[in-house]
Amino acid sequence: IRELGQVSIFVHAASPPRRETQTALAVTEAEWRAMLEVNLNAGFLIAQALGRHMRENKVRGRMLFITSLHADSPRNLPHYSASKAGQTMVMKELARALGPDGIRVNALAPGAVPGAGFKGSPGLVDRIPLGRVGKPADIAPMAVAILSERYGAYMTGSTVVVDGGIALYNWLDAQG
């Protein structure tokens, strides 16, 4: 903030590397702590500091947390799922605290978007009603819309899902 001056937009999209699937009994303490440190703790503490900055400087700012469908249902990544569910609640708490100051806080939950080590699982595309995995070009315009004054001005405390419809599919059905 000292170097940039006024900050009006914050997007928390960081996440440490993870295995494709991992049961609750297989996650190590180090993996658990690393995931929560980046996804939950860092996001909250940065957003909290920026929220204070925005409030003190009367900045009508915007914050966006990139969460995940994993926040709402178990998908064999307990540390990732817990961190994303925590992000959703942090987003809602910040929206409630900062809304009276005109600061909007929302979340975007993308579906399966390959990249950063994510390759998907066999049969994944078969479980997506739109018949394909997402692309960054599917997600980015929605993030811009949420952050914009034109489309997102009356929106706070909300999670927008952009997933090709995969949330309609019960992941546990695939486990047989």
What are these regions (language model features)?
Residues 6-9, 22, 54-68, 100-103, ...:
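Active-site loop of short-chain dehydrogenase/reductase
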Residues 16-17, 55, 62-86, 91-100:
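Catalytic loop of short-chain dehydrogenase/reductase
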Residues 21-24, 28-33, 124:
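Substrate-binding pocket helix/loop in short-chain dehydrogenase/reductase
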Residues 88-91, 98-113, 151-162:
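Conserved Rossmann-fold SDR core element
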